[in-house]
Amino acid sequence: MEDPFEEADQPTTEPGMVLDSVEAGDTTPPTKRKSKFSGFGKIFKPWKWRKKKSSDKFKETSEVLERKISMRKPREELVKRGVLLEDPEQGGEDPGKPSDAMLKNGHTTPIGNARSSSPVQVEEEPVRLASLRKAIPEEDLKKRLGSTGSQPNSEAESVPENVPKPPLLPPKRPLSSSHEASEGQAKDATSSGGTARFIISTSITTAPAATTAATSLAKTVNLSVTPSPAPRTLPAAPASTNTTATPSLTHMVPAKQPPIPPPKPAHRNSNPVIAELSQAINSGTLLSKPSPPLPPKRGIPSTSVPTLESAAAITTKTPSDEREKSTCSMGSELLPMISPRSPSPPLPTHIPPEPPRTPPFPAKTFQVVPEIEFPPSLDLHQEIPQQEDQKKEVPKRILDQNFGEPHIPSRLPPLPLHIRIQQALTSPLPMTPILEGSHRAHSLLFENSDSFSEDSSTLGRTRSLPITIEMLKVPDDEEEEEQTCPSTFSEEMTPTSVIPKLPQCLREEEEKESDSDSEGPIQYRDEEDEDESYQSALANKVKRKDTLAMKLNHRPSEPELNLNSWPCKSKEEWNEIRHQIGNTLIRRLSQRPTPEELEQRNILQPKNEADRQAEKREIKRRLTRKLSQRPTVAELLARKILRFNEYVEVTDAQDYDRRADKPWTKLTPADKAAIRKELNEFKSSEMEVHEESKHFTRYHRP
C-alpha cells in the first residue's frame, strides 16, 4: 500500500521535471535527489501517522478492561465511590436506582438520583444498546421477527405493530429507559413496543408450545398482578397467542415500573446475569412473577391448554413458579420471556452452575438464551424429580406469600443477589434447615420470597445449589414434562421431595464454589462476546463437574461389576485352568514324530560311537593317501605347476637379523652368484615378458 506522503513527494519526480532540473544547471538541485530519500518516507511517515491516530479498538478494549476490573471490586466499594447506587432495599431509594447504577456502571459515569439521571440514561442506553445490536446480526432479528409467522395471526399482527414503532434502539431503550418508563407514556409506548418486539423475537424462537403455555401463564399473572399496565398491552395479548402475551407482559411491566435493566445479555460472570435478574426484581418482582418458573416450562407443552382455563389456578401456579423463578433466577422481564421459551430447569441466577447455557441467539436474548440451552439430557433429568416436589410445595408456599402480599414483593423486591450471597456467606443460619436431607434441594431451590428478602443468604446458596441439583439426574424429558404438569396444578399435594443423588461432598463443594463465584451483581452489562465466552467456559466447567457427579451416580454396583468383569478365581479354579492349558500343550507335543519315525523316514540317521569312529578312520586314510601321492616340489617345478614365488622360502623379519656379525647377513660371492643364477633362470624360463619388449631382456632374444 503506497503511503500518501510518498505520493506527495512523487509528483516532483516526473521525467520532464527531472530533465528540466538537470538542464537548469548547478544552482538548482536536481529534483531526482529528493526521491533518493523517498524510501525513508515509506518507512517512517506511515508509522508516525498510524501512531498519531487513536485506535477505537484500543479505547473499547480499555473500557472493557475497566469494566472487568470494576466487576472484581466488592459492591460496597463501588457504592462508596459512587459508581454504583445503593440498592433500594438498603437505602430505601427508588427501585429504579440499581438498574440505573448498573447502566451507569456500564458507562462508567457517576450516578445521580435514578429519576434525575433517567433522561441521560435513556440517551446513553440507546447508544450502548445500539452497539450491542450491531454485534447481533440484523438477520437474526429479522429471522426472529419473521418466526412470529409460526404463531397465530393475532400474535403476528401484534408483533408487526410493535416492531415498526421502535427502530433498533427503542427496544433497548425500553429496557434501559424502563427506569423512566413510568414517567412518560410516550416513552412507555415505544418501550413497550420495542420490548415486545425484542422479547417476541427471543421467545418466538423457542418451541411454540412451550412459549404459548408459559406466555399464557405469564399473561394470567399479569392480569392478576399488574392491573395498571395490563390494559396497555393486554389488548394485544389476549388477541395474540401467549407468546405475544409474554412480550406484552414484559413491556407492560417495564412501562409500569421504572427500573428495568439494559437489555445487554451479558452474563459475564454470574454477576451480570445476577445483576440483570436482581435488577429485574428490583424493578418489580412483578416481572419475576409473571414468568412461570422453568420447571413449569418443562411441563408447559401440556400446561398450555389449561393455562387460560383457570386464571386463579394459573396465577397461583405462576406466582409460585414466579417465586421459584425469583428465588432461583431473580427473573426480570427477561425471565418472562425465558420461562415460556425454555423447557429447561429453573434458571439459576448463579452462572457457574449454568453449564450448557450458551446463548443460542445473539446476546440480545438476555437470560433467555442461557436457559434455553440447558442440555435437556443433563438438566431436565435431575430437575424433574425436584421440580415435581417443588411445584407441589411451592404453589402452597407461594400462595401464602404471593397472595398474602402480592404487590409488596413487586414493590419491594428481594435484596439483590450479591447482597443475599454476602449475607449467606456471613450468616449460616438460613442454611441449617435447608441442609437437611429430603427437603434440602426443594427448600434451596424455592425458598420463600420472604426468606429471600429477609435472608439473602439463602438466596446466594439457593442460587448456586439449584444448578448442581439440576444437572445431576436425567430422566427422559417427555415423561417428566407430562408428570410435572399435573403436579404443578395440584397445589395441595404433599411435597414428595426427590433429591438427585449427588454425593454430599460434591454438593458442599459446589455450594462453596457457587457462593464464591456469585459475588454480587455489578449492575451493568459487559460486551456480549466476552460474556458469552466467559459464560461458556464457566458453563463447561460446571458441566464437567456435574457430568462427573452423574457418572459417579451411575457407577455400577458390585454385583453388576462382578457380572461384567473377570470373576475372581479360587486356587482350585486356577489349577484347573493350568491343567487344561498343560493338556493342550502336551497333546500338541505328542503329535510331533518320534526319532524312530524320523529314522524310518531317513530323516534322522541312527549313530553309534563305533560308527562315528569308523567314519573318522576312513577320512584319515583317504587324506593320507592323497598326501602320500603328492608330487615333490621339484616335480611340480618341472611340470611347471609351481612357480618361483610359490616355492621360495620366506623368513619372518623378526627372525632375520641384519647385524653384521651374524653369518646369514654376509653373503659370500658364491651365494650371490647362486641367487643371481636362480633369478636369471626364473626370468628366462618362468617370467613372462611381453613380445614387444623381449629384445630388451638378456634371455629372450628376438
From Swiss-Prot:
Residues 163-173, 342-362 have a biased composition (Pro residues). Residues 233-250 have a biased composition (Low complexity). Keywords: Actin-binding, Cell projection, Cytoplasm, Developmental protein, Neurogenesis, Phosphoprotein, Repeat. Pfam families: RPEL. Residues 508-518 have a biased composition (Acidic residues). GO terms for biological process: actin cytoskeleton organization; closure of optic fissure; enteric nervous system development; negative regulation of integrin-mediated signaling pathway; neural crest cell migration; neural tube closure; positive regulation of catalytic activity; regulation of cell cycle. Binds PPP1CA and actin. Belongs to the phosphatase and actin regulator family. This is Phosphatase and actin regulator 4. It comes from Homo sapiens. The lineage of its organism: Eukaryota, Metazoa, Chordata, Craniata, Vertebrata.
